UniProtKB/Swiss-Prot annotation:
The proteasome is a multicatalytic proteinase complex which is characterized by its ability to cleave peptides with Arg, Phe, Tyr, Leu, and Glu adjacent to the leaving group at neutral or slightly basic pH. The proteasome has an ATP-dependent proteolytic activity. Disulfide bonds: none annotated. Belongs to the peptidase T1A family. This is Proteasome subunit alpha type-7-B. GO terms for cellular component: cytoplasm; nucleus; proteasome core complex, alpha-subunit complex. SMART domains: Proteasome_A_N (SM00948). Keywords: Cytoplasm, Nucleus, Proteasome.
Length: 249
């Protein structure tokens, strides 16, 4: 049993690669992350741990730009994320130099997933302990896209998805409430999904919004607080309306 448990390239008798499963467990223990694709907007949101008083909070951002039209959020080991993000950025620039055109969102997703898969079957390495949510606008179609990859190298396209801590709760919320919206409504849906699992409201949330026209923009804490206040007001109004509704006889 111990041999299957430790060796990265050896399957257990029942078909498991334990090191990949342990990497998936690292993702489940990581920060919550959510991605939502709207009609003209894509939004990434992550759970933000409170930083020590003397630490520069800008140095611990969990949403990264890969190119002018692609961004990535991740859940899992931050050091692994840094390596994967740097490799993806180099690939984006290399593609521009070689092909003289920007990568598509699917292309860079395939590259990242391929890299993650390679690290599940090579000796002397271990799987990346992170799952990624990749958003952007394709340069040829101008359509928004959202993809997810995991430590096994699997990738898939989504309308909305979540990963990390309590991702099942967020995913259930998104399944019940997702509609293809635009602008502010897309941002609010991502924040509402995060508020399902994140305590202390907006101060523990990091949000990035991308549009075809303006590119990627990180929301300031004050902007997030405004959205949270609006969401809480809507929730209170809905509860009041429910209490005031006449009971059916």
């Amino acid at each position: 049993m111990a041999r299957y448990d430790r060796a990265i390239t050896v399957f257990s008798p029942d078909g498991h690669l334990f090191q990949v499963e342990y990497a998936l467990e690292a993702v489940r223990k990581g920060n919550a992350a959510v991605g939502v694709r709207g009609s003209d907007t894509v939004v990434l949101g992550v759970e933000k741990k409170s930083t020590p008083k003397l630490q520069d909070s800008r140095s611990v951002r969990k949403i990264a730009s890969l190119d002018t039209h692609i961004a990535l959020a991740c859940a899992g080991l931050k050091a692994d994320a840094r390596v994967l993000i740097n490799r993806a950025r180099v690939e984006c620039q290399s593609h521009r130099l070689t092909v003289e055109d920007a990568v598509t969102v699917e292309y860079i997703t395939r590259y990242i997933a391929g890299l993650q898969q390679k690290y599940t079957q090579s000796g002397g390495v271990r799987p990346f302990g992170l799952s990624t949510l990749i958003v952007g606008f394709d340069p040829y179609t101008d359509k928004p896209a959202l993809y997810q990859t995991d430590p096994s190298g699997t990738f898939s396209a989504w309308k909305a998805n979540a990963t990390g801590r309590n991702s099942n709760s967020m995913r259930e919320f998104l399944e019940k409430n997702y509609k293809e919206t635009s602008g502010k409504e897309t941002i609010k849906l991502a924040i509402r999904a995060l508020l399902e699992v994140v305590e202390s409201g907006g101060k523990n949330i990091e949000i990035a919004v991308m549009t075809q026209k303006d590119g990627l923009r990180q929301l300031e804490e004050a902007e997030i607080d405004e959205y949270v206040a609006e969401i809480e007001a809507e929730k209170a109004a809905a509860e009041a309306a429910k209490k005031g509704a006449p009971k059916e006889t």
